[in-house]
Amino acid sequence: MRLVQLSRHSIAFPSPEGALREPNGLLALGGDLSPARLLMAYQHGIFPWFSPGDPILWWSPDPRAVLWPEKFHLSRSMKRFHNASPYRVTLNYAFDRVIDGCANHRDEGTWITRGIEEAYRRLHELGHAHSIEVWRDQELVGGMYGVSQGALFCGESMFSRQENASKTALLVFCAEFIRHGGKLIDCQVLNSHTASLGAIEIPRRDYLDHLAGLRQQPLASRFWVPRTLFLPRK
């Protein structure tokens, strides 16, 4: 196994099976963040992740963290909160503000560089990247964004400025995603937060098999049209 240097003149990627074991999933470096290359990456279970000042790094870890949306873990305390939720949840109302919120609210330091923000904004303009917003009155208090692959949604990042805001984003999205034919959410690498919400690890090969099938399954017509998904309970 060796790290592959990508060419700027080809958007092809090596097989994810050739990714390094340590660091887990590192597959390639270089290339660019053009829409065509990003879409090629997601179609093959690969995503970019790198720190400011580093070259672009491409990953496909094994195991892979995923969330079956029907298995979202709704704790008793979160259920009580949601039943009296003060939040309004929307879809694709404020993509730029959501990715900016994610970039500026990472305790461990952001990996969302200006280049990443610009690249995913282009994907959003092309209809491939989407945001879920959580509002309290007129204030954006949380949200998440990711990339659609048919009936699979590749979650990229989330943020929260008030209690349970990011959990609310994922909870409401899961319910809506299921209703419109969504089957699986890619969480990339398991962490304590996503694990607490029901995410699990599966072998990379299983994830790639799911991806190959689900990306060919369309969601219900006009699912990604901007709209309100949830209104406050009080």
From Swiss-Prot:
Entry's EC annotation: 2.3.2.6
Localisation per UniProt entry: Cytoplasm
GO BP terms: protein catabolic process
InterPro entries: Acyl_CoA_acyltransferase, Leu/Phe-tRNA_Trfase, Leu/Phe-tRNA_Trfase_C, Leu/Phe-tRNA_Trfase_N
GO molecular function, a single term: leucyl-tRNA--protein transferase activity
Function recorded in the entry: Functions in the N-end rule pathway of protein degradation where it conjugates Leu, Phe and, less efficiently, Met from aminoacyl-tRNAs to the N-termini of proteins containing an N-terminal arginine or lysine.
Protein name from the UniProt record: Leucyl/phenylalanyl-tRNA--protein transferase
